């Protein structure tokens, strides 16, 4: 489904949803690129096997004709095998050369110092080539083991895990959990606690975090009857790093904002692009030396029922 047609396509589906839970009903799945103006599509799976946090399970099917409820659905998914270890070798090569990267960092620094922008996030790419086909199932299991509290995803070869919730809308309630400001984790509890304390007290990281919070709040507020956030940031720890995070919760005014419109309005946040957004993105496009593609974009899962 083309992104420009996604809302209308979903709205025109006739739904028989006896589960009536977040995520039930037809679900569009996709990844919005860092530059959301680039062409991108969403997928409507014909078969979804779902499980909620409270243990409920259900199956969603997409049919061209009405399904007789007395019919049974044959879930012949075949045997599910745990991934096995491979003897693959890997070659790591840089994408953008170090000179281009350092030039981009210098350009961003100078733009901030001159007052042209408040922030810009510069990235560089690395290519890892395997001697054997990469088992995505194995990658996802590793991500689940290491980043179990994060959102794991696999969309058409775009695989990862993120602890950040850009935006969720359920029955008119809007929530977001932006992250910005980061410190490493070492695996030693005492050292990590010290790093977390330093992160919370860091003026630089608190400013960086507040830029993101203000941007998300100011973007969503025109659609809300109220929108509030936690008075202080908290630590969100994952396997290798820890972030500053702030939960945001509000109520949408009617007519309710569509979650796709919210995603496009928010993305990319200053945590991944910069601020002001248009100026920062223009600088990134001029100096970064690569196309980010879906990196730094957003994974999205949209259910019609919610």
Predicted regions and their residues:
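Conserved, well-ordered active-site substructure
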Residues: 1, 24-59, 130-182, 227-251, ...
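Non-catalytic accessory segments adjacent to catalytic cores
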Residues: 5-127, 225
């Amino acid at each position: 489904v083309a992104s420009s047609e996604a809302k209308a396509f979903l709205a025109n589906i006739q739904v028989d949803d006896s589960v009536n839970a977040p995520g039930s009903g037809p679900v569009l799945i996709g990844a919005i690129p860092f530059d959301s103006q680039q062409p991108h599509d969403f997928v409507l799976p014909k078969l979804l096997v779902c499980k909620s946090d409270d243990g409920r399970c259900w199956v969603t099917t997409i049919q061209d004709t009405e399904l007789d409820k007395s019919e049974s659905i044959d879930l012949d998914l075949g045997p599910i095998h745990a991934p096995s270890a491979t003897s693959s070798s890997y070659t790591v090569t840089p994408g953008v050369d170090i000179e281009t990267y350092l030039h981009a960092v210098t350009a961003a620094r100078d733009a901030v110092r001159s007052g042209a922008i408040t922030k810009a996030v510069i990235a560089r790419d690395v290519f890892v080539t395997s001697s054997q086909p990469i088992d995505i199932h194995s990658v996802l299991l590793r991500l689940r083991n290491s980043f179990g509290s994060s959102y794991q995803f696999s969309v058409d070869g775009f695989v990862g895990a993120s602890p950040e919730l850009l935006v969720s809308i359920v029955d008119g309630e809007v929530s977001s959990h932006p992250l910005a400001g980061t410190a490493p984790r070492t695996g030693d509890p005492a050292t990590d606690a010290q790093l977390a304390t330093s992160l919370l007290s860091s003026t630089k990281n608190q400013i960086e975090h507040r830029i993101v919070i203000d941007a998300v709040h100011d973007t969503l507020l025109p659609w809300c009857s109220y929108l509030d956030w936690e008075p202080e940031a908290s630590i969100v720890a994952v396997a290798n790093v820890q972030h500053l995070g702030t939960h945001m919760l509000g109520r949408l005014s009617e007519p309710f904002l569509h979650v796709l419109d919210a995603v496009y309005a928010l993305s990319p946040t200053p945590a991944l692009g910069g601020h002001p957004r248009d100026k920062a993105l223009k600088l990134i496009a001029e100096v970064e030396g690569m196309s980010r593609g879906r990196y730094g974009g957003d994974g999205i899962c949209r259910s019609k029922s919610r």
